[in-house]
UniProtKB/Swiss-Prot annotation:
<dbReference type="GO" id="GO:0008360">
    <property type="term" value="P:regulation of cell shape"/>
</dbReference>
<keyword id="KW-0573">Peptidoglycan synthesis</keyword>
<dbReference type="GO" id="GO:0008716">
    <property type="term" value="F:D-alanine-D-alanine ligase activity"/>
</dbReference>
<dbReference type="GO" id="GO:0071555">
    <property type="term" value="P:cell wall organization"/>
</dbReference>
<keyword id="KW-0963">Cytoplasm</keyword>
<feature type="domain" description="ATP-grasp">
    <location>
        <begin position="141"/>
        <end position="346"/>
    </location>
</feature>
<comment type="function">
    <text>Cell wall formation.</text>
</comment>
<keyword id="KW-0436">Ligase</keyword>
<feature type="binding site">
    <location>
        <position position="313"/>
    </location>
    <ligand>
        <name>Mg(2+) 2</name>
    </ligand>
</feature>
<feature type="binding site">
    <location>
        <position position="299"/>
    </location>
    <ligand>
        <name>Mg(2+) 1</name>
    </ligand>
</feature>
<comment type="pathway">
    <text>Cell wall biogenesis; peptidoglycan biosynthesis.</text>
</comment>
<dbReference type="GO" id="GO:0046872">
    <property type="term" value="F:metal ion binding"/>
</dbReference>
<keyword id="KW-0133">Cell shape</keyword>
<dbReference type="Pfam" id="PF07478">
    <property type="entry name" value="Dala_Dala_lig_C"/>
</dbReference>
<dbReference type="InterPro" id="IPR013815">
    <property type="entry name" value="ATP_grasp_subdomain_1"/>
</dbReference>
<dbReference type="InterPro" id="IPR016185">
    <property type="entry name" value="PreATP-grasp_dom_sf"/>
</dbReference>
<dbReference type="GO" id="GO:0005829">
    <property type="term" value="C:cytosol"/>
</dbReference>
Length: 359
């Protein structure tokens, strides 16, 4: 049987560049080499694209950049693949499916998806619109509200507004403290601060504004952090739910990736059966409301006192590192990492085949 040619995209111009490298290494190591011919395509923080043929271990360390061959992804629908530029000569490598492992802006926000749509190339994950909606936490929450799905109260602040601190304090008065200040367009909890009082607000606003001109200020809830993995196109399925018990006050960037395993990942989450089922049903409702394809990790907050569930956010390219919840939840639900990757690739082909091309 002829092997499918898979291009794994990693790196990117994003604050989550390093997380992408970790996820890509894990995915490449778990793709079945008997089924797939793998092409590793890295994007530097400067936006330079390279085809990398070296040791997978050098991806996570960043050493791959020294050994990459300058490349671009296609030039038209006639050339659906990787074009390289080496020693004055061009090379062309046809690709069957692209697996974007690009977390955050310029990868998870619809930009790469738009490029791949123009090239008519099958790709893993959500389409342009759904990717963009989920990348922007404000629009995600507005979709939740429109669909009648529960999400914490919030206020939106734009860059220049942070100069008028008193106006912001008045604007968020109804939220109370603690509250969370977040960049609207970033993942992995980069730039997020839990604000306990007015004195902590200016620093939190300045930090978030480093990453985005649009900021989300959200009511703080004394909550357990619950996550559920969703897989599928028209008929998605939800995994069992897991719970994160962070080593820090909340599951921030350092707790996610650099705390040496001090945060606890409880799989399955210690929930009553009916609450577990509620999580799974709500995850699928959120997935459908956002018209998602392929995969997503749906994150919840569950009020410790009332047990009420709130949708927090949706990640269309969730982490795939060795400690990431998305593959771990599926493994505990009966799908091995390699089987999960097989299904994602098949779903990408299915989505591509369903597109209308009559014009």
């Amino acid at each position: 049987m002829e092997k499918k040619k898979i291009a794994v995209l990693f790196g990117g111009q994003s604050g989550e560049h390093e997380v992408s490298l970790m996820s890509a290494k894990s995915i490449i190591n778990n793709l079945d080499k008997d089924k797939y011919e793998i092409y590793m395509v890295g994007i530097t923080k400067k936006g330079e694209w390279y085809l990398y043929r070296g040791d997978v271990g050098k991806i996570e360390t960043g050493e791959w950049e020294k050994e990459g061959i300058p490349a671009i992804m296609g030039a038209s629908t006639k050339y659906r693949g990787i074009i390289t530029f080496e020693d004055g000569e061009n090379g062309f490598y046809p690709i069957d499916v692209v697996f974007p492992v690009l977390h955050g802006p310029n990868g998870e926000d619809g930009t790469i998806q738009g490029l791949l749509e123009l090239l008519d190339m099958p790709y893993v994950g959500a389409n342009v619109l759904s990717s963009a909606l989920c990348m922007d936490k404000v629009f995600t929450k507005r979709i939740f509200k429109e669909a009648g799905l529960p999400t914490p109260d919030f206020v939106v602040v734009y860059g220049k507004e942070i100069e008028d601190l008193e106006a912001i304090k008045k604007k968020i008065e109804h939220l109370g403290y603690p509250c969370f200040v977040k960049p609207a367009n970033l993942g992995s909890s980069v730039g997020i601060t839990k604000v306990h009082n007015e004195e902590e607000l200016p620093g939190a606003l300045k930090l978030a504004a480093k990453y985005d001109r649009k900021l989300l200020i959200e009511r703080g809830i004394d909550a357990r952090e619950i996550e559920c993995s969703v897989l599928g196109n028209e008929n998605p399925e939800a995994s069992i739910a897991g719970e994160i018990v962070p080593s820090n006050e909340f599951y921030d960037y350092n707790a996610k990736y650099f705390d040496g395993g001090k945060s606890l990942l409880l799989i399955p989450a210690p929930l009553p059966d009916e609450k577990m089922e509620e999580v799974r049903k709500l995850a699928i409702k959120a997935y459908k409301a956002l018209d998602l394809r392929g995969m997503a990790r749906v994150d919840f907050l569950m009020d410790r006192n009332t047990g009420t569930l709130y949708l927090n956010e949706v990640n269309t390219i969730p982490g795939f590192t060795k400690i990431s919840m998305y593959p771990k939840l599926w493994e505990s639900s009966g799908k091995s990492y390699s089987t999960l990757l097989d299904e994602l690739i098949n779903l990408a082909v299915e989505s591509h085949n369903e597109k209308c091309r009559e014009w």
